[in-house]
A protein has these predicted regions:
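N-terminal helix-turn-helix DNA-binding module of bacterial transcription factors
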Residues: 1-59, 73, 338
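Short acidic capping loops at alpha-helix termini that bridge into adjacent secondary structure
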Residues: 180, 214-218, 269-274
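Alpha-helical recognition/docking segments in bacterial nutrient-uptake
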Residues: 2-5, 57-171
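Periplasmic-binding protein-like
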Residues: 115-123, 182-185, 220, 241-251, ...
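Short beta-strand segments enriched in small/hydrophobic residues
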Residues: 17-19, 54-70, 172, 180-189
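Flexible loop/turn connectors
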Residues: 234-339
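Hinge/beta->alpha junction and helix N-cap segments in small-molecule ligand-binding domains
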Residues: 67-76, 94-102, 158-168, 184-233, ...
């Protein structure tokens, strides 16, 4: 039986693009859509156990809500989760939402309209969970976000310790001699459990512990987790604070945009500016220069979330909350600053 990787290989498009076509994502060119759908027809590929492309949430399916339409890391997890659920014979539906949308309110509406058997949230805002999740009674999992402490017995969570990982990323830059560090990404939230907030405040905490002054208004620029937003925000940051010698991007997609912005401003990476990202997406291994990043395991996040959800669907048990390991992967985008 053909797999999503076979479709990517035969069509010449990335797995992420294939996944977007399968899930009726709007951000795909017509040429890519036609080619991928042609390969799907020729191979007889079956995206789920019902052997059909689900274009909207269906009754009794496990529904996956993806927060952000251009977050490559979440799309990678999505692909792995879909494959695992397919193996277990589960029907799956996917809903893509804007990064600022209320994903929990969407889930509540789906409960009323289509009665899904369970939810997987790929990213979520803790404020939205606190406000509305209490009316959801089916088992659910939050991936890449921390629901520990929210008190919902039917909501598990699996994530990296974003606060600790961000501290380690900034510590890595400090170990190379950087003290003039800028931060790009997230929306500047203060709520614990929000990925962007935990990474931002982890980075700021490490600078504080190291005795490094950090002027947030000058050295931090918010951005959605996309390359385009990373480019725009990094450009604003570097034009405002040209003394910066290193940038910590709160996601790899933001980092890739930031590197392009630096290039367009006449800066060489890593000679003039060092950049470290977060996530460890596949593209980070092929950027020029190769991106140094905090790597978290998309496969482990997918595996644990699916295992937990399926177990709780069949055997009622309390929610669990786990942190998965992370590590710094050294690429070519960081070096000591010029004297």
């Amino acid at each position: 039986m053909a797999t999503i990787k076979d479709i990517a290989r035969l069509s010449g498009y990335s797995i992420g693009t294939v996944s977007r076509v399968i899930n009726s994502h709007p951000d795909v060119s017509e040429a890519a859509k036609r080619k991928i759908e042609e390969v799907i027809r020729k191979t007889g590929f079956q995206p789920n156990s019902n052997a059909k492309l689900l274009k909207q949430a269906s009754t009794s399916a496990i529904t996956i809500l993806v927060k952000g339409t251009k977050n490559i890391f979440l799309e990678t997890i999505l692909e792995e989760i879909q494959e695992l659920l397919r193996i277990h014979g589960e029907a799956v539906s996917v809903v893509f939402l804007d990064e600022l949308a209320d994903e929990v309110e969407t889930a509540v509406q789906l409960c009323a309209e289509r009665k899904p058997k369970g939810f997987i949230f790929l990213g979520a805002n803790p404020d939205y969970l606190k406000k509305s999740f209490g009316v959801i009674t089916v088992p659910a999992v939050l991936v890449s976000g921390d629901a520990d402490g929210l008190g919902f017995e039917n909501l598990s969570s699996f994530c990296t310790d974003d606060f600790a990982a961000a501290k380690e990323a900034v510590g890595y830059l400090l170990s190379k001699g950087h003290t003039k560090i800028g931060i790009v990404g997230g929306m500047g939230e203060r709520e614990h459990g929000n990925v962007g907030a935990d990474r931002l405040y982890g980075a700021m905490e490490k600078l504080k512990e190291s005795g490094i002054s950090f002027e947030r208004e000058r050295c931090y620029e918010p951005a959605k987790f996309s390359a385009e937003a990373g480019y725009d925000s990094a450009r604003r940051l570097l034009e405002r604070a040209p003394e910066i010698t290193a940038v910590f991007a709160l996601s790899d997609t933001v980092a890739i945009g930031a590197m392009r912005a630096a290039k367009d401003l006449g800066l060489s990476i890593p000679d003039d500016l060092s950049v470290i990202g977060f996530d460890g997406i596949e593209y980070s291994r092929y950027s020029v220069p190769r991106l140094t990043t905090v790597e978290q395991s998309s496969s482990l996040l997918a595996q644990r979330s699916v295992e937990d959800l399926l177990l709780r669907l069949n055997y009622p048990r309390p929610a669990v909350h786990e942190k998965i390991p992370f590590r710094i992967v050294e690429g070519e985008s960081v070096k000591k600053p010029k004297k």
